[in-house]
Amino acid sequence: MKNILIYLILFISIAGCNKKIEQENTAELKDKQIRLFWNWFVANEERFSKVTNNDKVLKEILNHASTIEGGLAFEVNSIKNGIKSLTISADGVKQLIPTVQKMVEKSPKIKSWKFIAFRQKKDKKLSTEIIYLSDQLKLEPSKMKFFPIVENDSLQLIIYSPGINKENYNEIFYGGSVLLDNLVGEYKFMTQVDNYDFHNMPTRKEDLNQLTPLFELSAFIDNYDAMKNKNRVD
């Protein structure tokens, strides 16, 4: 019996060590892939800066970044004076937050490029713009609303928009998720909102009266976070 117990302890210890080594090897491999990605980017950044079609640059970046971790998203934008920005996004996947942070932390210093972690909150003009997801499908933030559900320090949201149905739900969900990142800020949205979904706008007046305009979402989340922190201190 004593021998069996010793064997079990040894087995657990070895298994624990193996798991730790595996995690360290995975982290080292990811660091290496990030380093190789940025080395490749530096070697090509002058060419990227001259390309007017950002989609072409984006396609190359996505291809080379796929070795780091699946699920990452990228956005290339021209800012001004020949400077471009590369936004690295977790695309709503919380598990990818450390990878995004590490990639930007390890990014090179290049005068003509700005590297940004997560989609940033945009100005209030976004709430009045129309976002076209396709020729026949659009989102109008000014006509969208939300309903919060707060339970035990958990925030869930139902986002309402006109015209949502089974056929366009997936497209609405992805386009709407990017919109929420732009309205609130991707990092804040991911870390403060536990779950969310998109529903078709109700028609009954009593239901509509319970909803809040979508452009107020950022302020609501700020207040929710402040209240949650206050309760923890108390």
Segments from the language model and where they lie:
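Glycine-rich, aromatic-bearing surface loops/beta-hairpins
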Residues: N165-D234
